[in-house]
Amino acid sequence: AMAEALLGAGKNYAIVFGVIIGTGVGGGLILNRRIHHGRLFIAGEWGHQILYPNGRKCYCGKMGCVETYLSGPSLEKYWVELGGKPLSLEEIIESFEHNPNVEYLKWRKEYLANFGMALSNVINIVDPDAVILGGGVSNISFLYDEGIAAVRENIFSNKDDTPILPNKLGDSAGV
């Protein structure tokens, strides 16, 4: 998050929420070019906000965490639950994006709804100048049109125009 805020897609914004969606879901909050850790060092930990009470079990012990709906492994698991054969996230999208079946359309629709609800909660609370998406799942192209539209549907303000941008520095920016 810090590298993107200082040198990447967020360099022209004062308040940046950096999102990581990959094997897990996490984030970082940058305020005026400084990382905000919070008192308990959990600021930005949106992957463990509850999206669905009594939802899917998370490794953290809680139920219904965002991570259990948005991470790459959760997407692959849900695909199998819908009756699809075990595939990687990349294989699912490559196989069905241009030739969708009923399972793929349901899988995609649920992901977009969950992405929209989860990220809009962050925007409603933090009200950042920009959100930068990173991690392997951020490479899904439909996040940048339909995903953003799903976020906008859930924002409190009908004037929201918070930029939701792909990262510029790649997955190794924090190294």
Language model regions located:
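Short glycine-aspartate micro-motif
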Residues: 16-20, 26-28, 59, 132
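A cytosolic small-molecule/anion-sensing beta-strand core signal
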Residues: 31-32
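ATP-binding/phosphotransfer module of carbohydrate and carboxylate kinases, centering on a glycine-rich
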Residues: 6-13, 35, 50-175
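Short, intrinsically disordered, charge-biased short linear motifs at domain edges
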Residues: 42-51
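Small-molecule pocket liners
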Residues: 27, 46-47, 56
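Conserved catalytic-core motifs of eukaryotic protein kinase domains, centered on the activation segment
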Residues: 41-42, 144
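Acidic/histidine-rich catalytic cores of soluble enzymes
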Residues: 1
